[in-house]
Amino acid sequence: MASASPEQNQNHCSAVNNSNMLMQGNLPTLTLSGKIRVTVTFFLFLLSTIFNASFLLKLQKWTQKKEKGKKLSRMKVLLKHLTLANLLETLIVMPLDGMWNITVQWYAGEFLCKVLSYLKLFSMYAPAFMMVVISLDRSLAITRPLAMKNNGKLGQSMIGLAWLLSGIFAGPQLYIFRMIHLADSSGQTEGFPQCVTHCSFPQWWHQAFYNFFTFSCLFIIPLFITLICNAKIIFTLTRVLHQDPHELQLNQSKNNIPRARLRTLKMTVAFATSFTVCWTPYYVLGIWYWFDPEMLNRVSDPVNHFFFLFALLNPCFDPLIYGYFSL
């Protein structure tokens, strides 16, 4: 079957925009694997909400017990913002995915189609960027400790920049997502509304570029930065731990990494590992789809659902990680 020309594609998109319909052979339905995905999603939603909210409450109580006027340490401030980002992702991505898989159709209208699509991507950018901030901060803390000590506002600036970039990079979602109505192969309207990006890009490569940009900012760039930072951290830890292999005295002045800092460095490496392990399968599947869209017909729905659910474990694991290293 010959592919449509750009002019034909443009005419088809105009027809979709004017009639608010899209020809589709098979309308989606809620399958057994979809029901399992919904159940697991809401279970992870409860776990992540409880874990992250509990840590925020613990931080609040810890702050109240501190001496009046004494601020949180830089690491605790970073953990607070990572927890807020994880909680935001939990409260937006998980319920939205669960409810949409239940209804299959989009009942929330055009406005919420755009707004929720924006908030979903914003809440995914924020934890990824906050992970970068933590990795950079901890790496600089051991490679340039004096510079970090003299520049107390650097951490706050990086945190603010992470939230700002998350909001800016998610902005296109407000434009490209729209509500359409699907129809069956005969052209009969089924009243099947969906929130999609069909015909939002003038050329196919515009969408390809946007998808690659989003993928890079959500995964490739954060992964690259955290790997470099954590490689420096691991190298420094290894060098220090081998200074005295028989009796390591971390609290003595001859050691340039005290026990508390050593614990936070290990925690940073654990965060990066959790991020990499949880999200890599999901994005590998996405890359595969870009180069071979027919893979959806070869990869079963349970496998697709599993990779997505595995990614949702990341905001659940993070509170457990800083809970473990806080013992």
Swiss-Prot record:
InterPro entries per UniProt: GPCR_Rhodpsn, GPCR_Rhodpsn_7TM, GphnRH_fam_rcpt
Protein name: Gonadotropin-releasing hormone receptor
Gene Ontology terms: biological process: cellular response to hormone stimulus; G protein-coupled receptor signaling pathway
Membrane-topology descriptor: Multi-pass membrane protein
TM regions (residue ranges): 38-57, 77-96, 115-136, 164-183, 212-231, 281-299, 306-325
Cysteines paired by S-S bonds: C113-C195
Regions of this protein lying in the Cytoplasmic compartment: 58-76, 137-163, 232-280, 326-327
Domain of life: Eukaryota
Keywords: Cell membrane, Disulfide bond, G-protein coupled receptor, Glycoprotein, Membrane, Receptor, Transducer, Transmembrane, Transmembrane helix
PROSITE patterns named in the record: G_PROTEIN_RECEP_F1_1, G_PROTEIN_RECEP_F1_2
Signal peptide: none
Localization: Cell membrane
GO terms for cellular component: plasma membrane
Family, similarity comment: Belongs to the G-protein coupled receptor 1 family.
A Gene Ontology molecular function term of the record: gonadotropin-releasing hormone receptor activity
Described purpose of this protein according to its UniProt entry: Receptor for gonadotropin releasing hormone (GnRH) that mediates the action of GnRH to stimulate the secretion of the gonadotropic hormones luteinizing hormone (LH) and follicle-stimulating hormone (FSH). This receptor mediates its action by association with G-proteins that activate a phosphatidylinositol-calcium second messenger system.
Glycosylated sites: N17, N101
Intervals, Extracellular compartment: 1-37, 97-114, 184-211, 300-305
